[in-house]
Amino acid sequence: MSQSQSHSQSQALNHTTAPAERGQCESIDLTAKIALIDGHWQPRVVAEMNDYQFKVVKVEGEFQWHRHTDTDETFIVLEGELRIDFRAGPSGDGSIVLRAGQMAVVPKGVEHKPCANAEVKMLLIEPRGVVNTGDGATDERTVENDQWI
């Protein structure tokens, strides 16, 4: 394939489609999507795969302690440094620190609290319909599911 053909195909795939147009292959610019988010702790869906959603979010400060009884949750740090505190996880209480390019999977049922001393930009992967504040817990940081950007 020539360089111009490759460039043309790349341009054809580099577009944004509405969620209703699933089934199309597309390039998603995570940096551009995150730039559309004004506040912190407001995850927004950028893609779906089967029953899983990929959500971008900006965070700063401490979130609340919460757990997801029925599902694991994946954190991928794109920029910044995130600490996740745990209570009674598989290894007991503790915390981990994730930097840009690192990820962690919090097992289902493990109580956790993400914390960031400065703004962190990250990608979350979790099943469709998961409430960001966990099982039964709601507060001012609880956001409506399935908000696409």
Which residues does each predicted region cover?
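Conserved short histidine dyad/triad with adjacent acidic residue
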Residues: 39-40, 53-69
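Well-ordered beta-strand positions in beta-sheet-rich domains
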Residues: 56, 95-97, 113
